Amino acid sequence: MLSPKRTRFRKQHRGRMKGISYRGNRICFGRYALQALEPAWITSRQIEAGRRAMTRNARRGGKIWVRIFPDKPVTVRPAETRMGSGKGSPEYWVAVVKPGRILYEISGVAENIARRAVAIAASKMPIRTQFIISG
């Protein structure tokens, strides 16, 4: 699963997801892509599940690019812990995704295979997405 090698700080504020994605919203590498339509935190496990589903479905042919990276640590407090005594420990990593962001790209396969692979990857995502074609 994806996670940063090292970060400057162990814990982060939650922040908020306002507006649309102005970066990473165009197809850069492949021919077909999966684009987010809603804002969400996508965990490294979900990213990996989508990537695996796409590679299994595309089989030998085709190249896949993952265009998001989980660089935000999410902290969780232990169960049945009283309030106070600081922030919880970092538990997992998420990628902050805004509407319009490209999640995956694929090329080197026929459109029907790409559609099928992307649809399976989309079912692993916690948000509504759309299939787009470059050009």
Curated annotation (Swiss-Prot):
Post-translational modifications: Partially alpha-N-monomethylated at Met-1 (10%), whereas 90% of it is blocked to Edman degradation, probably by trimethylation.
Principal location class: plastid
Subunit structure: Component of the chloroplast large ribosomal subunit (LSU). Mature 70S chloroplast ribosomes of higher plants consist of a small (30S) and a large (50S) subunit. The 30S small subunit contains 1 molecule of ribosomal RNA (16S rRNA) and 24 different proteins. The 50S large subunit contains 3 rRNA molecules (23S, 5S and 4.5S rRNA) and 33 different proteins.
Pfam family, one: Ribosomal_L16
Highest taxon, organism lineage: Eukaryota
MF (Gene Ontology): rRNA binding; structural constituent of ribosome
Entry-annotated residues carrying N-methylmethionine: 1
Known role: Component of the chloroplast ribosome (chloro-ribosome), a dedicated translation machinery responsible for the synthesis of chloroplast genome-encoded proteins, including proteins of the transcription and translation machinery and components of the photosynthetic apparatus.
Subcellular location: Plastid, Chloroplast
Listed name of the protein: Large ribosomal subunit protein uL16c
UniProt xrefs under PROSITE patterns: RIBOSOMAL_L16_1 (PS00586), RIBOSOMAL_L16_2 (PS00701)
This protein's GO CC annotations: chloroplast; mitochondrial large ribosomal subunit
Organism: Spinacia oleracea
